[in-house]
From Swiss-Prot:
Taxonomy, superkingdom: Eukaryota
UniProt keyword terms in alphabetical order: Developmental protein, DNA-binding, Gap protein, Metal-binding, Nucleus, Repeat, Zinc, Zinc-finger
Role summary: Gap class segmentation protein that controls development of head structures.
PANTHER family documented for this protein: PROTEIN HUNCHBACK, ZINC FINGER PROTEIN
The keyword rRNA-binding appears for this protein: no
Protein name as catalogued: Protein hunchback
Zinc finger (C2H2-type): 1-5, 11-33, 39-50
Gene Ontology molecular function terms on file: DNA binding; zinc ion binding
Record's GO cellular component terms: nucleus
Entry-linked InterPro entries: Znf_C2H2_sf, Znf_C2H2_type
Protein location: Nucleus
Phylogenetic lineage: Eukaryota, Metazoa, Ecdysozoa, Arthropoda, Hexapoda
GO BP terms in the entry: segmentation
Length: 50
């Protein structure tokens, strides 16, 4: 919890210069580097990563 207060972001993305406080944030960020779009609209052809 203290990392939030002191501004430390020790977790780094291996693909870019993104840093964060915890691994769950990195897991979410890593979707931005993926070419997969797993969430699709049932009514149209729209798809998203998130």
């Amino acid at each position: 919890h203290i990392l939030k207060h002191n501004g430390s972001k020790p977790i780094r993305c291996p693909e870019c210069n993104y840093t964060c406080v915890n691994r769950s944030m990195l897991t979410s960020h890593m979707k931005s580097h993926s070419n997969t779009y797993p969430y699709r609209c049932l009514d149209c052809n729209y798809a998203t990563k998130y």
